[in-house]
Design a protein with these regions (language model features):
Chain A
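Bacterial N-terminal signal peptides that target proteins for export
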Residues: 1-8
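A residue-level marker of the well-folded mature domains of exported/periplasmic proteins
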Residues: 22-318
Chain B
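Membrane-interfacial amphipathic/re-entrant helices at transmembrane-helix boundaries
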Residues: 2-68, 102-115
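Hydrophobic core segments of alpha-helical transmembrane domains in multi-pass membrane transport
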Residues: 30-43, 71, 120-124, 150-156, ...
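Single transmembrane alpha-helix segments in multi-pass membrane proteins
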Residues: 39-105, 133-140, 280-290, 324, ...
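Membrane-interface helix caps of multi-pass small-molecule transporters
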Residues: 73, 97, 125-138, 156-160, ...
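Alpha-helical transmembrane segments within multi-pass membrane transporters and channels
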Residues: 103-149, 296
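Helix-loop-helix "hairpin" substructures at the membrane interface of multi-pass membrane proteins
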Residues: 112-120, 124-131, 185-260
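Transmembrane helix-bundle core of multi-pass membrane transporters
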Residues: 142-207, 234-236, 256-265, 309
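Transmembrane alpha-helical segments in multi-pass inner-membrane proteins
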Residues: 246, 256-323
């Protein structure tokens, strides 16, 4: 008898607390991102932490858990833990790689977790509820259009440094080539991989300088690589190169644009802060109950001296 | 008789049969490989032989080349070190942070830079001491110890840099840059340092008692112990030597870009080990040659250079070409085993 009474009492209390928590639902949001292994991902980690602080302050019932992973396997394990241990209601994920993470993400979604995928799409879009991404095509196109406009009717010789062989890099380079093809006087001499790495870009640029006696402009396609490219040009004391365009919005490069540097007149954004946008949109939609747009594209814009200030984050590691 | 008796064909000739010719050729394998590559490169692009290109190639080879000279000692003694790339990155980051913080009290002068260099050598030596001690006294496989530190060093650097870049103060960078970009008698300084390190390494390995001990330990550690060689001490010293080489390479590397990022020195360990092996040092230890290592380091860099100077191979296949050349050079050396 005593036991049954206690059991009834206990379940009444539990039911009460459950209904209480339902009136102010507590939201646990998991964020899974690559660990900071180069400049851009360092920016992602920085902006994710900034967004966590801001969102948790704004919505006291929201708890955000950020996990960083060094590879796809680790990331797959982490999202499994987030779903089973932390009982997350929503997942914001920037996948290390598309194909290997599609199944794990689909499994999490099947458990009723709302999934927002950032930047790198999954191979099966059914595994996600919402998609937030930068515009890789625009990243290449905007840079290419600047080359067309800047080099003008006389055109010129251009060399390109590519990133790492990936779909992202292919999209960017194809869009750049398509944009500069509008001016037949612009000649793309060669495009080799600099692996989004300063040292490799330095070597590739040195060899371009050996090989081509006249280069008018360089599309470094990334700010880390632009660092190496500028040093190689400086070392060779070549005066024929009019300008270098990197991309992604590294703070040092944005600073150069702000200061009116001759060699670095513009930059093209591919902001690591897109993770913060994705987190904000996801949290807002969870809290207010309003559905989130299926696809949100963060545009790649041309940074010039006039608007550089709004892209400058001096505290970010990137 | 006017004609001498023909020697017994079965006994004497084997010493000059194709096999022994191959053996001799095998020793020169890496050099022949490099020459063949240079010829091909010149045919593909005459700019290959310009002084500026050759100096670019040799300067690039200096980083992993200096490390590879130290690595030769470790490998000959029967060890291995997988951590050198991560260690170079950590040293680069640490010395930049140290110099930046010294600027406040010492200014952006030579003193600051010298202290930074000293710190680089000290960190390298300490890391080597740690490796050597853990491997010999702790009795852990060198592969495991250095696999562990490979992860540790890079993680610490990534932590220090918050995943981004650690950048050298601009004023210090200006004063420091001649160490990489400067020339002495028209030769870039990194090449001169590389040559000096190789020369010194060759002397130590072939002309000193210590060098003979290293080779003896690598060829048979047990016998070396019976011969009253201080095996533990000699082994620790090889790792310290390598650590100092890594420090030296980093001292030359830092003024190049004035920054350290988590991708600094990535895969340098494989380049260094490949240079040693291409150069004819046996991976199982016992014997090796410093000059071979130097040629190996230059060969590896040349492949990348040639691929950048030409357009005939799809950029997707660059790594395949490197792999193929490594295997080919090793093939021509196999006569020695």
């Amino acid at each position: 008898m005593q036991a049954i009474k206690r059991f009834v009492l206990l379940s009444a209390v539990l039911a009460g607390s459950a209904s209480l928590s339902q009136s102010t639902p507590r939201q646990v949001i998991g964020v899974s991102i690559p660990s900071a292994d180069h400049g851009w991902t360092a920016g992602v980690v920085y902006h994710a932490n900034q967004a966590k602080a801001a969102l948790e302050k704004k919505y006291p019932n929201v708890q955000i858990i950020i996990k960083t992973a060094k590879d796809s396997t680790e990331q797959a394990n982490q999202i499994q833990d987030l779903a089973t241990v932390n009982k997350i209601g929503a997942l914001v994920i920037l996948p290390q790689e598309s194909a290997p993470l599609t199944r794990p993400v689909a499994n999490v979604k099947a458990k009723g977790v709302f999934v927002t995928v950032v930047d790198r799409g999954l191979t099966d879009p059914k595994a996600q509820d919402a998609y937030v991404a930068g515009d890789n095509t625009a990243f290449g196109r905007v840079a290419g259009e600047y080359f067309v406009q800047r080099l003008g009717a006389s055109g010129g010789n251009v060399v390109v440094l590519r990133g790492i062989p990936t779909v992202i890099d292919n999209q960017r380079v194809a869009a750049f080539n398509a944009a500069v093809a509008k001016n037949p006087k612009i000649k793309v001499l060669d495009a080799k991989y600099g692996n989004w790495n300063r040292d490799d870009a330095f070597k590739v640029m040195q060899d371009y300088l050996t090989r081509f006696p006249k280069i008018d402009a360089v599309w470094a396609s990334d700010d880390d690589m632009a660092v190496g490219v500028l040093r190689a040009i400086q070392q060779a004391r070549r005066k024929d190169i009019k300008f270098v365009v990197g991309g992604a919005g590294m703070k040092e490069m944005i600073k150069k644009v702000m200061d009116g540097d001759q060699m670095m007149p513009v930059n093209v954004t591919y902001p690591p802060s897109m993770i913060a946008d994705a987190m904000r949109l996801t949290v807002e939609s969870r809290v207010t109950g309003k559905p989130m747009k299926a696809t949100t594209i963060i545009p790649s814009v041309l940074v010039t001296k006039a608007n550089a200030k709004q892209f400058y984050f001096p505290d970010s590691p990137f | 008789m006017s004609t001498p008796n023909p020697p017994l064909p079965e006994v004497a000739p084997p010493r000059v049969t194709p096999r022994s010719v191959l053996t001799r050729l095998g020793t020169l394998g890496p050099l022949l490989g490099l020459l063949a590559l240079a010829v091909v490169a010149t045919l593909l692009n005459p700019d290959f032989l310009t002084a500026s290109n050759i100096s670019n190639v040799l300067t690039r080879a200096a980083f992993t080349g200096i490390i590879a000279v130290g690595m030769t000692f470790v490998i000959i003694s029967g060890g291995i070190d997988l951590s050198v790339g991560s260690l170079a990155a950590l040293i680069a980051g640490s010395m930049i942070l140290i110099m930046n913080s010294l600027k406040g009290s010492l200014g952006a002068g030579v003193g600051t830079i010298l202290l930074g260099m000293l710190a680089a050598l000290a960190i390298g030596a300490l890391a080597g001491l740690f490796h050597g001690t853990t491997i010999t006294r702790g009795r852990i496989e060198p592969f495991i110890v250095t696999l562990g530190t490979l992860g540790i060093y890079r993680a610490v650097l990534t932590y220090l840099a918050q995943g981004g870049a650690i950048s050298l103060d601009l004023d210090i960078g200006d004063r420091y840059s001649p160490v990489y970009y400067g020339r002495l008698l028209g030769i870039p300084i990194p090449i001169l340092v590389f040559a000096a390190v190789a020369l010194l390494g060759g002397l130590i390995l072939n002309r000193t008692r210590y060098g003979r001990y290293v080779q003896a330990i690598g060829s048979n550690e047990q016998v070396a112990r019976y011969a009253a060689i201080n095996v533990t001490g000699v082994k620790i010293a090889t790792y310290v030597l390598l650590g100092v080489c890594v420090g030296l390479a980093t001292i030359l590397y830092v003024p190049q870009l004035g920054s350290a990022t988590p991708s600094t020195g990535l895969l340098w360990e494989l380049d260094a080990i490949a240079a040693v092996i291409i150069g004819g040092t046996a991976l199982r230890g016992g014997s090796g040659r410093i000059w071979g290592t130097v040629v190996g380091a230059v060969l590896l860099v040349t492949i990348g250079n040639v691929l950048n100077l030409t357009n005939i191979i799809s950029v997707y296949l660059n790594a395949a070409v490197t792999g193929l050349v490594i295997i080919l050079v090793a093939f021509f050396q196999r006569g020695r085993r």
